[in-house]
UniProtKB/Swiss-Prot annotation:
<feature type="binding site">
    <location>
        <position position="31"/>
    </location>
    <ligand>
        <name>Mg(2+)</name>
    </ligand>
</feature>
<comment type="similarity">
    <text>Belongs to the arthropod phospholipase D family. Class II subfamily. Class IIa sub-subfamily.</text>
</comment>
<feature type="disulfide bond">
    <location>
        <begin position="53"/>
        <end position="196"/>
    </location>
</feature>
<keyword id="KW-1061">Dermonecrotic toxin</keyword>
<dbReference type="GO" id="GO:0031640">
    <property type="term" value="P:killing of cells of another organism"/>
</dbReference>
<dbReference type="GO" id="GO:0046872">
    <property type="term" value="F:metal ion binding"/>
</dbReference>
<keyword id="KW-0443">Lipid metabolism</keyword>
<protein>
    <recommendedName>
        <fullName>Dermonecrotic toxin LrSicTox-alphaIB1</fullName>
        <ecNumber>4.6.1.-</ecNumber>
    </recommendedName>
</protein>
<dbReference type="InterPro" id="IPR017946">
    <property type="entry name" value="PLC-like_Pdiesterase_TIM-brl"/>
</dbReference>
<comment type="function">
    <text>Dermonecrotic toxins cleave the phosphodiester linkage between the phosphate and headgroup of certain phospholipids (sphingolipid and lysolipid substrates), forming an alcohol (often choline) and a cyclic phosphate. This toxin acts on sphingomyelin (SM) with high activity (18.3 U/mg). It may also act on ceramide phosphoethanolamine (CPE), lysophosphatidylcholine (LPC) and lysophosphatidylethanolamine (LPE), but not on lysophosphatidylserine (LPS), and lysophosphatidylglycerol (LPG). It acts by transphosphatidylation, releasing exclusively cyclic phosphate products as second products.</text>
</comment>
<keyword id="KW-0479">Metal-binding</keyword>
<feature type="active site" description="Nucleophile">
    <location>
        <position position="47"/>
    </location>
</feature>
<keyword id="KW-0964">Secreted</keyword>
<dbReference type="GO" id="GO:0005576">
    <property type="term" value="C:extracellular region"/>
</dbReference>
<dbReference type="GO" id="GO:0016042">
    <property type="term" value="P:lipid catabolic process"/>
</dbReference>
<keyword id="KW-1015">Disulfide bond</keyword>
<dbReference type="GO" id="GO:0090729">
    <property type="term" value="F:toxin activity"/>
</dbReference>
Amino acid sequence: ANKRPAWIMGHMVNAVAQIDEFVNLGANSIETDVSFDKNANPEYTYHGIPCDCGRTCTKWENFNDFLKGLRKATTPGDSKYHEKLVLVVFDLKTGSLYDNQAYDAGKKLAKNILQHYWNNGNNGGRAYIVLSIPNLAHYKLITGFKETLTSEGHPELMEKVGYDFSGNDDIDKVGNAYKNAGVTGHVWQSDGITNCLLRGLSRVKEAVKNRDSSNGFINKVYFWTVDKRASTRDALDAGVDGIMTNYPDVIADVLSESAYKANFRIATYDDNPWETFKN
């Protein structure tokens, strides 16, 4: 049977030491917060207070130091290499910026990632990257990122980059933001809320419907932040591709239950995260 590849996404992995911790618990993907200074430079991997219930909100690194640690964790042959870690979501905290700084934020982000993660295109980290943007008005971050990689001579690295708008906006409005950004493909759609609160699956189901329709723009759907077995099963039953969690071992446990093992498998590097799964 054709099984849906699943991404177990470790939530709020902001210190280099946490990469090992989350992957060892079963995550094949991590989510990292990126804060910006007032000139739109990515500054720290930092969430801050408040954050998810039961988590320390204040772990951090300088962004470039995190990128170097992440590169080691995703470069075959490195002593810190994890074969399993195949996707990284950068949760871009652009709320501190003016809307007209989005392009610059994308440009500066691209320069940092190119140098410290991709090693200027010379055997850098291999993980796929999702740029997750909280505000539809900041779609020019994508443009700035893309144009910078091109002007720096590495347009091919865009093959490793996907996108997400994380504001739980109306799906049609999300589609329009991608039109404005000139994006076709590589689209992950998030839906969710902090683990301190409950959220139903109605918008997830809407996103799944878009993903599975012949004219949809979404390739993958993920739900956050899921820490309990029952809510994991509900999300899998709704057909998500990814689940973001504080407890990767809980998600891995559910995926190993016979009902889910028959229909899902843990995604590997050979699973293209920009490809819509066809049953």
